Amino acid sequence: MYKILFIDEEKDTLQDFEEFVEKFHSKIKLEPITNFPLSNLEEMIECIIKIAPDAIISDYRLNELKTDIKYNVPYNGVDLVEEYQRIRNDFPCFVLTALDDEAVNSSNDVNIVYVKNILYNQEEGNAKAKFLDRVISQIEHYENRIERYKQELA
């Protein structure tokens, strides 16, 4: 079972993600873990380390709506995943957004940015590689790299 951490400032979107994962059918079970962004990037990174997910999926604009959180979030989803990848290089991270052009422009890796509408099956259509299939694949590739590195060091 893989633990997938989803970070968003909207409670409804966190619930939508849980439902999205529940509807996903695969031989590999996924455990969705949802979290609001914290008001400090360093604290958020510490929180992620404690959760120990197998992948991180974050909304891009974490400070856009203030209905469910009452504090300022001074970073976006790209900032968050890039900061985490400084600690764990090549860790499976993804950013979901309605503003994919903006997120792509601010990201060092355009391949981590996906349109948020996939949570509502509006964008995946007949794609053979669905979003969560890609997440699982990235986790497996990451784990295989770690294992190869361990064998090289042994």
Positions of predicted regions on the chain:
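Conserved acidic segment of CheY-like receiver
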Residues: 2-25
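Short His-Asn-centered micro-motif
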Residues: 7-9, 58-59, 94-99, 115-117
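Catalytic phosphate/metal-binding cores of nucleic-acid and nucleotide-processing enzymes, i.e., regions
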Residues: 20-24, 62, 100
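Acidic, metal-coordinating helix/loop segments flanking the phosphotransfer/catalytic sites
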Residues: 33-58, 63
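Short, flexible/disordered intra-domain loops and linkers
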Residues: 62-76
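A short, hydrophobic beta-strand element within the central beta-sheet of small alpha/beta folds
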Residues: 79-86, 90-103
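Short, electropositive alpha-helical surface patch
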Residues: 105-126
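C-terminal output/effector regions of signal-responsive regulators
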Residues: 140-154
